[in-house]
């Protein structure tokens, strides 16, 4: 209030304000607003030449604006020694500064000391006059634009006044982002976006939420309640929006298309996520490990890795997860549910992303290519794993035995060796496994299923790895080479066996009792006395030379 009174007194002194009706100072002291003032310009000697205007003023900002208007409405030149106020004002101001005329533009560019040499008035002028804002009136620049109707203004104040046109009666506007709401309660909820307030806390796990409805949905995780059920397949969901998203799986509809590459999706969120593939910039960086992300939500999820927080626990096996979606996927291991089925071959999956990756087997699509060696993959994660082959990096180390891995999933699988835990049990024969994939493969023994068929000869296999090995027979490819002797093999296991033979010969070559047996192994591995004698047992001398004994006789 004191500041407003001081501003008003300075305004009266500098600009010349004649009060109509009640004295504004009295109004300010009584905390009444708005008040009405009649503003007059300073004129040269004759009060009769003064022009005036009347407007309603609101405190603070409009006093400043009105003062500017008064200053700008002065006559082009100021060539006077005495300035006086309009008739009716008892105060007379003597001006002994402006003995020389100044144009308006000169006044704007002149330093404050030239305009007001008195320290008191320099301070006042500095506070309430903004020359930069005034200049926009002459240049025609209108930097403040209305988002609703695209109308532009030279002053922010004018934009705020204009916005009231768009705000309907009985509407509530957010001061932070200007968003308008029909109800005050909706505005209150919206404000939590800016404040970060989360007043609704889960009594079960302590997790907090901004909205009560989100807490209600969250509680279903603990109760297991899923009120929204799909009529097509019977699958149930916590939230109605999840059911809506799920239904698209059955229709096959993909209305959301990427403008960059033409790829279509069945959900807008999937399209949004996909678009970040085209954006190389990753502005969101983890302070803990310097890993960067192209979405803030990804960074938020990543941070949980460092905190170790696992709020979502499996009731079946007690395993904890840091995301509800991960827990949902995990539960399918126990139930055996596989809702995502391939239309091409009938194979089913418990995760939609696995089905997407699987489909590329049929299409042959491999969009992810290694820049180092040119090898292509059907999934980005596989390319990431592959790249470690070139770097040799193994960041995931077992605390129990020190063994290192290039993937966290491999470390997780490895740890089960130490714990001896076998969660996955065959209902047919009771045999237990430490991996769900091993159980799935094992079940084919009972069912006789062999889903992997060779296109060349029609032979079928119960494992994809067996089919891969088999295909080499037709191609004749021998990619596994012995560094010691240069011999090549079509399977890594055959190379391993070959190496063991060499190691065994080095260890036992000086023992006469083992040389004859080793000779037979060497003959099978292809070591010969002379060309064209494949299959014959080599001489002991040849065995000794092969084993590195220097050819000494035994």
Swiss-Prot record:
It is found in: Nucleus. InterPro entries: KRAB, Znf_C2H2_sf, Znf_C2H2_type. It holds the Pfam family zf-C2H2. One of its GO terms (molecular function) is zinc ion binding. A zinc finger (C2H2-type) spans 116-138, 144-166, 172-194, 200-222, 228-250, 256-278, 284-306, 312-334, 340-362, 368-390, 396-418, 424-446, 452-474, 480-502. Keywords: DNA-binding, Metal-binding, Nucleus, Repeat, Transcription, Transcription regulation, Zinc, Zinc-finger. One of its GO terms (biological process) is regulation of DNA-templated transcription. It comes from the Eukaryota. Residues 1-47 form the KRAB domain. Its main location: nucleus. Disulfide bonds: none annotated. GO terms for cellular component: nucleus. May be involved in transcriptional regulation. Belongs to the krueppel C2H2-type zinc-finger protein family. This is Zinc finger protein 714. The lineage of its organism: Eukaryota, Metazoa, Chordata, Craniata, Vertebrata. The gene is ZNF714.
């Amino acid at each position: 209030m004191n500041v407003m009174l001081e501003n008003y007194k300075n305004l009266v002194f500098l600009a010349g304000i004649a009060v109509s009706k009640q004295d504004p100072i009295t109004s300010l002291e009584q905390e009444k607003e708005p008040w009405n003032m009649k503003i007059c310009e300073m004129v040269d000697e004759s009060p009769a030449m003064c022009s005036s205007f009347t407007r309603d003023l609101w405190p603070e900002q409009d006093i400043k604006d009105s003062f500017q208007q008064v200053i700008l409405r002065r006559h082009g030149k100021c060539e006077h020694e005495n300035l006086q106020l309009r008739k009716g004002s008892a105060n007379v101001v003597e001006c002994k500064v402006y003995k020389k005329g100044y144009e308006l533009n000169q006044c704007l560019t002149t330093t404050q000391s030239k305009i007001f040499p008195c320290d008191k008035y320099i301070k006042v002028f500095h506070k309430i006059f903004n020359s930069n804002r005034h200049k926009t009136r002459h240049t025609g620049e209108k930097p403040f634009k209305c988002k609703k109707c695209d109308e532009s203004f030279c002053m922010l104040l004018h934009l705020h006044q204009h916005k009231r046109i768009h705000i309907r009666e009985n509407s509530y506007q957010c001061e932070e982002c200007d968003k308008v709401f029909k109800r005050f309660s909706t505005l209150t909820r919206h404000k939590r976006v800016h404040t970060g307030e989360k007043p609704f806390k889960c009594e079960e796990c302590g997790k907090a939420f901004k909205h009560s409805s989100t807490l209600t949905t969250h509680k279903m995780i603990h109760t297991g309640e899923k009120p929204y059920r799909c009529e097509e397949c019977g699958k149930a969901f916590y939230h109605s929006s999840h059911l809506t998203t799920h239904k698209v799986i059955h229709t096959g509809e993909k209305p959301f298309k990427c403008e960059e590459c033409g790829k279509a999706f069945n959900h807008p969120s999937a399209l949004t996520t996909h678009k970040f593939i085209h954006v190389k910039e990753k502005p969101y960086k983890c302070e803990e490990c310097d890993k960067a992300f192209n979405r803030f939500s990804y960074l938020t999820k990543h941070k949980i890795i460092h905190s170790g927080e696992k709020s979502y626990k499996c009731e079946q096996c007690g395993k904890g997860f840091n995301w509800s979606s991960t827990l949902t996927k995990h539960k399918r291991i126990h139930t055996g549910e596989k809702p995502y089925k391939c239309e091409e071959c009938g194979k089913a999956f418990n995760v939609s992303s696995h089905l997407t990756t699987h489909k590329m087997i049929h299409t042959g699509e491999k969009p992810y290519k290694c820049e180092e060696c040119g090898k292509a993959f059907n999934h980005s994660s596989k390319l990431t794993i592959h790249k470690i082959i070139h770097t040799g990096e193994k960041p995931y180390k077992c605390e129990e035995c020190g063994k290192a891995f290039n993937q966290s999933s491999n470390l997780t699988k490895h740890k089960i060796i130490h714990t001896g835990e076998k969660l996955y049990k065959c209902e047919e024969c009771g045999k237990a496994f430490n991996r769900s994939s091993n159980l799935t493969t094992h079940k084919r023994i009972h069912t006789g299923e062999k889903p992997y068929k060779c296109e060349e000869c029609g032979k079928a296999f119960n494992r994809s790895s067996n089919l891969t090995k088999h295909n080499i027979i037709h191609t004749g490819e021998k990619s596994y080479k012995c560094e010691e002797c240069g011999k090549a093999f079509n399977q890594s296991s055959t190379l391993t066996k070959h190496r063991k033979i060499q190691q065994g010969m080095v260890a036992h070559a000086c023992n006469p009792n083992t040389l004859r047996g080793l000779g037979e192994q060497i003959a099978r591995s292809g070591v010969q006395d002379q060309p064209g004698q494949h299959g014959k047992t080599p001489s002991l001398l040849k065995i000794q030379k092969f084993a590195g004994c220097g050819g000494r006789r035994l």
